[in-house]
């Protein structure tokens, strides 16, 4: 068979294979010819897929919250936000202090009360210098020298002595003088009326000498310092009964500013002013 004859036999077949199908007829394509269908992922899905890759090895669940999970920590019974249980407030502390006796203050009162009353208190006798001071003030306001001053002059006389009465105190004294003393007082009545108030108000001005005397009562060896042993010796004489050693030690530590275990005169004055 010649070449031309062979081409003539194949020609119709090749032509038939290249013919287009009639209009309206769909010819199925093979799987090899049709590319696989793909859908473009959204940004949200790509982010979710990347998150799964990062956490997939640890087994943690991403995306929506896992069941039972919460941003708040589990409750521990300690109050809001894990705060520790409330401790007893200051009210309970104040209550304990209110019911607890102030042993230091009580000991100071028992120790120094009788001495201070004798040195500064209402029950002590006025000294000659104080009587002279009262006499001078009385005579200053007894302008007619009849031995009396009126209730109107009493306030100014008291201020001259350093005592600063309130208006209510002056009113009470004036009414007392007008009702019981005929509106005026002599010197003895003046001392009886003003003496106790004057002693209370002016003790810090008149009492330096008396404080020295009181300090010497404690300072038995006259070394200018008071020791615990000297306090223990002095207290029975002042109180008629001994004071417990720990109470004395506590009072001494309170005022012992330089920490030498003794009390000098300045510390002694501070101790008396506190109690």
Curated annotation (Swiss-Prot):
Binding-site positions, Ca(2+) 2: 219, 221, 223, 225, 230
GO molecular function: calcium channel regulator activity; calcium ion binding; transmembrane transporter binding
Region spans: Disordered: 1-112
Location(s), subcellular: Cytoplasm; Presynapse
Keywords assigned by UniProt, alphabetized: Calcium, Cell projection, Cytoplasm, Disease variant, Metal-binding, Phosphoprotein, Repeat, Synapse
Compositional bias per record (Basic residues), positions renumbered to this chain: 38-55
Chief localization: cytoplasm
GO CC annotation terms, alphabetical: cytoplasm; cytosol; extracellular region; synapse; terminal bouton
Binding-site positions, Ca(2+) 3: 256, 258, 260, 262, 267
SMART domains found in the cross-reference section: EFh (SM00054)
Coiled coil: none
Phosphoserine, modified sites: 42
Family annotation (Pfam families): EF-hand_1, EF-hand_7
Binding site for Ca(2+) 1: 142, 144, 146, 148, 153
GO biological process, one term: retinal cone cell development
Functional note: Involved in normal synaptic function through regulation of Ca(2+) influx and neurotransmitter release in photoreceptor synaptic terminals and in auditory transmission. Modulator of CACNA1D and CACNA1F, suppressing the calcium-dependent inactivation and shifting the activation range to more hyperpolarized voltages.
Annotated disorder: Cone-rod synaptic disorder, congenital non-progressive: A non-progressive retinal disorder characterized by stable low vision, nystagmus, photophobia, a normal or near-normal fundus appearance, and no night blindness.
Subunit structure: Interacts with CACNA1F and CACNA1D (via IQ domain) in a calcium independent manner. Interacts (via N-terminus) with UNC119.
The protein's name: Calcium-binding protein 4
The gene coding this protein: CABP4
């Amino acid at each position: 068979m010649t070449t031309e004859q062979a081409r003539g036999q194949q020609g119709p077949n090749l032509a038939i294979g290249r013919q287009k199908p009639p209009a309206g007829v769909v010819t199925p394509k093979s799987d090899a010819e049709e590319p696989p269908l793909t859908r473009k992922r959204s940004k949200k899905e790509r982010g979710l897929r990347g998150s799964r890759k990062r956490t997939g090895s640890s087994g943690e669940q991403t995306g929506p919250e896992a069941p039972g999970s919460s941003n708040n920590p589990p409750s521990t019974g300690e109050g809001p936000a894990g705060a520790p249980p409330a401790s007893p407030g200051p009210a309970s502390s104040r209550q304990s202090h209110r019911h607890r006796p102030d042993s230091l203050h009580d000991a100071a009162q028992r120790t120094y009360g009788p001495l201070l009353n004798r040195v500064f208190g209402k029950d002590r006798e006025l000294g000659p210098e104080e009587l002279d001071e009262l006499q001078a003030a009385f005579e200053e306001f007894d302008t007619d020298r009849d031995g009396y001053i009126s209730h109107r002059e009493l306030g100014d006389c008291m201020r001259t002595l350093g005592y600063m009465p309130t208006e209510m105190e002056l009113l009470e004294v004036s009414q007392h003088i007008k009702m019981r003393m005929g509106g005026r007082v002599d010197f003895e009545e003046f001392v009886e009326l003003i003496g106790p108030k004057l002693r209370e108000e002016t003790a810090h001005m008149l009492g330096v000498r008396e404080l020295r005397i009181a300090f010497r009562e404690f300072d038995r060896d006259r070394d200018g310092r008071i020791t615990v042993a000297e306090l223990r010796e002095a207290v029975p004489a002042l109180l008629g009964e001994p004071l417990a050693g720990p109470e004395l030690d506590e009072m001494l530590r309170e005022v012992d500013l330089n920490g030498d275990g003794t009390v000098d005169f300045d510390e002694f004055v501070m101790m008396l002013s506190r109690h």
